[in-house]
């Protein structure tokens, strides 16, 4: 397999764009953190997080670049890790930080135009698009990057969903474990709920790698996706936690 450190300059070469993404996230993070910190703390969080992010950029593994949608997800999670570290230094609890992370996702995906969400919801279950997603999963799973995502297509047999996706390896989980931040992974997983809600795609999940399960069992159906907060209402959050 190809070692991911063969591409250590991939993100550093795109430094300007990486910082642009960081600032885009800050607008969402600042809004979500307002009930918990002062404006002075907010500016300090930004400063601390930016320095943290600068140190993390060279450590982000190459998992396929622009040809893999998971790359953007991974970068977003690294940005959030930088903010998480800053919030920790401000003395915020895990639960409060987790709530800020979730609401930051909510604010981030709220920027998606409603018309795009309507189109995405209709496209998701068109047969040719389902086949395309299956092929994409197979292509990404075959990539030789050890720190990336691996998932497989799951056909429906009982009518409870249209199709599924079992993620057996998660780049975000690997990165967070490596940086002693595993306990926050379940909160990162919650970001899927506001995303699919905004895209008008029905989605549910009962297991996640972040909670110690072998796979994240994404299941897609027609209809609405429930809110991801508070997480105790979700099947994936129930039972013992192993983070």
What kind of feature is each model-predicted range?
Residues 194, 233-243:
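Short, cationic low-complexity segments
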Residues 185-208:
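Conserved short secondary-structure elements within globular domains
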Residues 172-174, 223-229:
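Short, charged/polar, Gly/Pro-enriched secondary-structure boundary elements
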Residues 75-179:
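Amphipathic interaction/junction segments at domain boundaries or subunit interfaces
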